[in-house]
């Protein structure tokens, strides 16, 4: 009897809720989510010993180009987990989780060691200050700092650099059609980027004509500026920049002394009939006077954002690194954005958009891929104004261009790009790394759901007087609940990769990687740089002189000066025929 009672007592104590563990059971009836195994991690990610001292001395440089998404090993003896596939990577983390110290610094070091060209958005200036010297002195990089916070301490970033370069080649060799075609291509890319920064043509509606015509007109003015106003003995300083484009459009919009003709119409009439600048402006040139004025006003409104005395120190001087140099040589660009002045944030989107489109053009000339992998580290991507970034995601990956947008919340993407745009960006990121969320974060709930569910053991225990019982069943459980995501320790992250199970990983503080900083990289003060502007009069004087037959055939009514420019006053001595005074072209309209 005592044995029976003891046995029942033991059974009653054995059936406890604490003994029911949420271990994976069944055959995936409620979900099959799980973590990657060590074997799968080894097969998916390249394991590269992180040897900073050797790399900086030029020894044992890594050959695998890619992104560091984790590490293994002890301090100072770490092995980096590198994803070397053609990918985009979305990083999500709240402020203060160490996105720069744990993620960016190791990746910048590895990018330099593996020879990738890269651009880094830098909201505080720390990246440029700490890594400019290392990239230049230790790894032999071309370094450019575009500082929108202190433009007088910035390198130049002339948006017309490539247009000017190929137009100079064309001017020296008029038969070089390839150079002229490249100049026209880069001019069209820049015009489209400025007139249509968000890339959404669907919202134009009935105004589509004005925007399309504005793109053509802007392309036309850029080409004329690049071709006919190069530096010369009288004007040795470069005048071909975006601010001069604004000034020319404004001057050409003014009415001339020829009734019913603007300076723009007279200027276009002076060009040879087969000149491409005349063709690009055809939509505006052949429209009604009021419509043409609206087109030119649209161009001015788009260019108005560049009118800033400080920004001129950046925009009006030649770029230290252009797209072709960026793609073919080891180059690093630091784009410093002022957190306290969001009015200049549009420049970041414009520069990234224009650079990426130029890189696409370079890749297309090299068999559809860039010679060297290019990475754009877009820190604070969520605080930037929206721009036409979707083609960069969809077309950049196959061309060896990797984008790394770093955001604080998925809500930032939805706010800037809408629900559909946010989903497109997320779907085009083959890697997602996240960790460290605010207590009330909704992003943690979304990502918990994205990790999926697994089938776990569940059950209940009931105790009667003489018959304790236990019931077991299967149920679903998130791989990580939102609460568990919010409590992830600093430096720990979750990595999701397309076609793979998620990975729990750890990124160490940059000091534990063996990363040390050298002397700060400082761009010298350039407060004494005077800006030179183009003007309509010089442009008219430098236009090619047309033949008499061309002058007689021109539809625009005006007289032609002996130097090839446009004479807006009637000629001094009107011709007479048969005793009757002949009118000069355009005089009948006065």
Where are these regions (language model features)?
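A short glycine-/small-residue-rich loop at the edge of a beta-strand within enzyme catalytic domains
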Residues: 46, 56, 346, 380-383, ...
């Amino acid at each position: 009897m005592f044995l029976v009672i003891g046995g029942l007592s033991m059974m009653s104590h054995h059936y406890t809720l604490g003994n029911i563990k949420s271990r994976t059971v069944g055959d995936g009836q409620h979900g099959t989510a799980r973590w990657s195994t060590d074997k799968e991690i080894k097969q998916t990610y390249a394991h590269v010993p992180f040897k900073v001292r050797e790399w900086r001395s030029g020894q044992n440089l890594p050959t695998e180009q890619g992104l560091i998404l984790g590490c293994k090993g002890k301090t100072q003896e770490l092995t980096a987990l590198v994803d070397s596939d053609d990918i985009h990577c979305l990083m999500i983390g709240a402020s203060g989780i160490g996105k720069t110290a744990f993620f960016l610094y190791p990746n910048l070091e590895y990018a330099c060691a593996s020879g990738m060209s890269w651009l880094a958005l830098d909201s505080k200036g720390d990246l440029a200050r700490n890594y400019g010297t290392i990239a230049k002195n230790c790894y032999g990089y071309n370094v450019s700092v575009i500082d929108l916070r202190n433009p007088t301490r910035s390198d130049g970033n002339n948006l017309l650099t490539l247009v000017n370069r190929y137009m100079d080649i064309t001017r020296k060799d008029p038969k070089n059609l390839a150079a002229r075609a490249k100049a026209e291509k880069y001019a069209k890319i820049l015009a489209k980027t400025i007139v249509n920064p968000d890339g959404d043509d669907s919202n134009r509606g009935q105004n589509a004509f004005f925007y399309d015509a504005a793109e053509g007109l802007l392309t036309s003015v850029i080409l004329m500026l690049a071709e006919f106003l190069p530096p010369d003995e009288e004007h040795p300083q470069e005048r071909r920049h975006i601010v001069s484009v604004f000034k020319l459009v404004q001057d050409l919009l003014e009415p001339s002394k020829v009734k019913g003709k603007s300076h723009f119409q007279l200027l276009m009439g002076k060009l040879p009939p087969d000149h491409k600048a005349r063709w690009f402006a055809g939509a505006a040139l052949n429209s009604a006077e009021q419509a043409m004025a609206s087109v030119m006003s649209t161009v001015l409104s788009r260019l108005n954002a560049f009118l800033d005395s400080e920004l001129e120190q950046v925009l009006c001087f030649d770029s230290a690194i252009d797209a072709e140099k960026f793609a073919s040589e080891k180059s690093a660009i630091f784009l410093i954005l002022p957190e306290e002045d969001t009015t200049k944030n549009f420049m970041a989107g414009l520069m990234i958009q224009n650079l990426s489109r130029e890189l696409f053009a370079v890749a297309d000339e090299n068999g559809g891929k860039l010679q060297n992998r290019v990475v754009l580290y877009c820190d604070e991507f969520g605080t930037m104004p929206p721009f036409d970034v979707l083609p960069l995601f969809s077309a950049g990956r196959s061309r060896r261009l990797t984008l790394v947008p770093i955001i604080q919340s998925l809500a930032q993407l939805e706010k800037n790009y809408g629900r559909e745009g946010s989903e497109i960006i997320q779907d085009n990121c083959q890697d997602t790394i996240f960790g460290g969320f605010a207590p009330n974060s909704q992003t943690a709930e979304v990502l918990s759901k994205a990790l999926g569910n697994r089938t776990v053991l569940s059950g209940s225990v009931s105790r009667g007087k003489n018959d304790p019982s236990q019931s077991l069943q299967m149920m679903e459980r998130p791989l990580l609940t939102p609460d568990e995501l919010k409590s992830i320790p600093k430096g720990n992250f979750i990595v999701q990769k397309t076609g793979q199970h998620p990975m729990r990983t750890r990124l160490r503080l940059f000091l534990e990687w063996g990363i040390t900083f050298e002397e700060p990289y400082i761009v010298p003060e350039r407060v004494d740089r005077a800006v030179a502007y183009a003007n309509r009069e010089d442009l008219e004087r430098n236009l090619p002189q047309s033949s008499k037959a061309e002058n007689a055939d021109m539809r625009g009514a005006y007289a032609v000066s002996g130097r090839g420019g446009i004479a807006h006053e009637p000629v001094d001595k009107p011709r007479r025929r048969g005793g009757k005074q002949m009118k000069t072209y355009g005089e009948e309209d006065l």
